[in-house]
Amino acid sequence: MTPLSSPLSQYWQTVVERLPEGFTETSLSAQAKSVLTFSDFALDSVIAHPEWLAELESASPQADEWRHYAGWLQEALAGVCDDASLMRELRFFRRRIMVRIAWAQTLSLVDDETILQQLSHLAETLIVGARDWLYAACCREWGTPCNPQGVPQPLLILGMGKLGGGELNFSSDIDLIFAWPEHGETRGGRRELDNAQFFTRLGQRLIKALDQPTMDGFVYRVDMRLRPFGDSGPLVLSFAALEDYYQEQGRDWERYAMVKARLMGDNDDAWSRELRAMLRPFVFRRYIDFSVIQSLRNMKGMIAREVRRRGLKDNIKLGAGGIREIEFIVQVFQLIRGGREPSLQSRSLLPTLDAIAALHLLPENDVAQLRVAYLFLRRLENLLQSINDEQTQTLPADDLNRARLAWGMKAENWPQLVGELTDHMANVRRVFNELIGDDEADTPQEEERSEPWREVWQDALQEDDSTPVLAHLADEDRRQVLTLIADFRKELDKRPIGPRGRQVLDQLMPHLLADVCSREDAVVTLSRITPLLAGIVTRTTYLELLSEFPGALKHLIMLCAASPMIASQLARYPLLLDELLDPGTLYQPTATDAYRDELRQYLLRVPEEDEEQQLEALRQFKQAQLLRIAAADIAGTLPVMKVSDHLTWLAEAMIDAVVQQAWTQMVARYGQPAHLDERQGRGFAVVGYGKLGGWELGYSSDLDLIFLHDCPMDVMTNGEREIDGRQFYLRLAQRIMHLFSTRTSSGILYEVDARLRPSGAAGMLVTSADAFADYQQHEAWTWEHQALVRARVVYGDPQLTSQFDAVRRTIMTTARDGKTLQTEVREMREKMRAHLGNKHRDRFDIKADEGGITDIEFIAQYLVLRYAHEKPKLTRWSDNVRILELLAQNGIMDDHEAQALTVAYTTLRDELHHLALQELPGHVAQTCFSKERALVQASWRKWLVAV
């Protein structure tokens, strides 16, 4: 055993002062001295439980003792009679065994592969032990879940990630997926439940038993987000539902995750074999699957973006050459060739590396270096986490913990450890880059083209200086370009740029100037790019991105030239520069039906319990998607209708995620309203009005929302902090508003306006569905019924959605007096025009002035309210274009007029989008759009001016 280093010997005196009663410095072995000096977690644990220290001193932990975990836990749970005592025993057991593992690991009594195995077996033992105890308890309460033939149904648990691979780290989340075989009902209990309800309740209790912090701590943080549909999906799925999902909707990244999936516990029964057989074809293709390479390239980009996005330094998991890259290298071969090569189907990394070597898929030397690097990094990670039982992969900045790690890794000192670590990570990065490949560097021709611009950049030319490379510019443009460069250099002098940053900037600027100054709009483009560069000069990683990826630089120049809005966004949020790396996705927005799934995948990388990171991630995802939509808009690959469709689908995905986050937080605090025990869903809906309801969002639109619930009176929540059910939904809505409006370093998510709710700002923030129906029928004004024309549920369970749709249909199909309706709609429009219309007589406000967008919207709303009692089909859609179609199809408006209004509407909307991209207000010269305005005004007179 390596003697303690000097800093640790000094720290030992602090440890001695904290030793539990009955233990002295002389009574402890050298082994105990080493472990307690190294790990505060071990020290705190034996202070609380001195008998554990005596146990360890008398008999050291053994390599194969994981075989006894299940028996030991069974003994510990023998006297457990309720959930509270179960939770206490699980926490004690986990802590006791973790101290034993920390002891063995610190002293190298057991090799590092075995440590990973012990950590994984411990987690599996605790998961299975808790599941089995709770299954029996639930069966006593509700009966045994059976299929129609009376065969009892088990809860099967898939361990994902490192747990599935038998490679769990010391302080880790556990990723789980719950499943049960067949539908049916419980039998033999005090009350019957269908199997879905039984297993959902069992799953909820199991998560609580493992995850909920108590005075004794927690067992594991449980992450269920890898299940089908993530947080918005059922907690537990039947085999049939799982099979349907993975066959019809399974994504590439879910396939990657499923490579490591392993059933927990005794898994050789018929149900387990059936589930494995069902999942295998989804994971491993029968053919050599080279189609996966592009997806893997995208994953590589995601790793790099995550490191930049989170500002990760000294991170041995996510940094360049870290653990994640080794896992990625191995997965490349598993996913491409695993279907044809059974030896590649192992869930564990090291056996798969052996198979890669045996199949000669990588050179032997590369495999050997990856193996050594992996074991080195995993030991370093586990030692780091065992100091405080803390989930971290970032190297410490303090001297004590650095000394601890150097000693634990058998290095002479911290610099030696860092040197070894750097060598290992460089080896990994080399293999990683060779396997996937990076963008090509500059060609010799590009270098030659940019060389003359080096003089312009480095010699700080004055306004009146001449240089051949600027000769093609007009005199005024040349002066402005030189002024912009000079001002930029002065700005740089105020910034604390390190030597590496200046080196990269000097490398980047000649290329940038060569590209920008070859454009006719060089002055405008350079004026937009220099503020962005000034914002990132102290963040070398972004300068390197633009310098090392010429394609990204070209896209940056093109987009900034086209849109000051995009230039402003990139300057404000430099992490968006990552999006420029892949033109395949930059100009091709996410499919309209895939935003929820993309966001779910994005959020999986963020700890579920870290609210601040969750808020940041939501905002960063939105900004990245907005950039892609705007880029496609500029490139002309998205027509106006599609731009709004994408912006609307994106907003709906964000609403879904925000509600999920708020719901999780509220349920953790209060439990859920008890009426949900008798029904599926959450009894909650979000209704979108205005542009969101009408599929017509713009780049900077806010969201008009109202919130509904169906909670009866006198219902309470079922959590430890019990509150009234309706109060729960009010707090849920308040939480949602807070999550939308909180300003982080990435800004707010959306401005949300909830004033369209019953009684406006004076009304309750969340309304029961019955009260909403009553208000609409007896109290609402005509303008509120107009607003309802453009309303639809954007989040909600089917039951509440149907209820809202029925109320909306009833209100809209109510027979109205035509003259009265015409007068009320016209007068409301005149009031709006007086308040919101353009005050500049020489300008036309595209939205608010006569002949503008709002007039078209009012015509459509008036005609629906006027004629829907005769033609109920008019209530089907909430967007203006399809309402105009319906008016023509149902004989209310002739085809020519409907088509002409549609063209006018989309033309005006298109102009608004493009003005937004130019950061210009929504008005134009009076001479613009005269044809469209005349047409709209004629239609307005026809329908809404009294004859």
UniProtKB/Swiss-Prot annotation:
Chain segments carrying region Adenylyl removase: 1-440
Keyword ATP-binding: yes
InterPro entries: GlnE, GlnE_rpt_dom, NT_sf, PII_UdlTrfase/GS_AdlTrfase
Entry's EC annotation: 2.7.7.89, 2.7.7.42
Enzyme class: transferase
Requisite cofactors: Mg(2+)
Biological processes annotated in GO: regulation of glutamine family amino acid metabolic process
Span list, region Adenylyl transferase: 450-947
Catalytic activity reported: [glutamine synthetase]-O(4)-(5'-adenylyl)-L-tyrosine + phosphate = [glutamine synthetase]-L-tyrosine + ADP; [glutamine synthetase]-L-tyrosine + ATP = [glutamine synthetase]-O(4)-(5'-adenylyl)-L-tyrosine + diphosphate
Superkingdom, taxonomy of origin: Bacteria
Entry keyword ATP-binding: yes
GO molecular function annotation: [glutamate-ammonia-ligase] adenylyltransferase activity; [glutamine synthetase]-adenylyl-L-tyrosine phosphorylase activity; ATP binding; magnesium ion binding
Cellular component terms per the entry's GO annotation: cytosol
Its job: Involved in the regulation of glutamine synthetase GlnA, a key enzyme in the process to assimilate ammonia. When cellular nitrogen levels are high, the C-terminal adenylyl transferase (AT) inactivates GlnA by covalent transfer of an adenylyl group from ATP to specific tyrosine residue of GlnA, thus reducing its activity. Conversely, when nitrogen levels are low, the N-terminal adenylyl removase (AR) activates GlnA by removing the adenylyl group by phosphorolysis, increasing its activity.
Assigned protein family: Belongs to the GlnE family.
The protein's name: Bifunctional glutamine synthetase adenylyltransferase/adenylyl-removing enzyme
Organism of origin: Salmonella heidelberg (strain SL476)
Phylogenetic classification of the source organism: Bacteria, Pseudomonadati, Pseudomonadota, Gammaproteobacteria, Enterobacterales
Gene: glnE
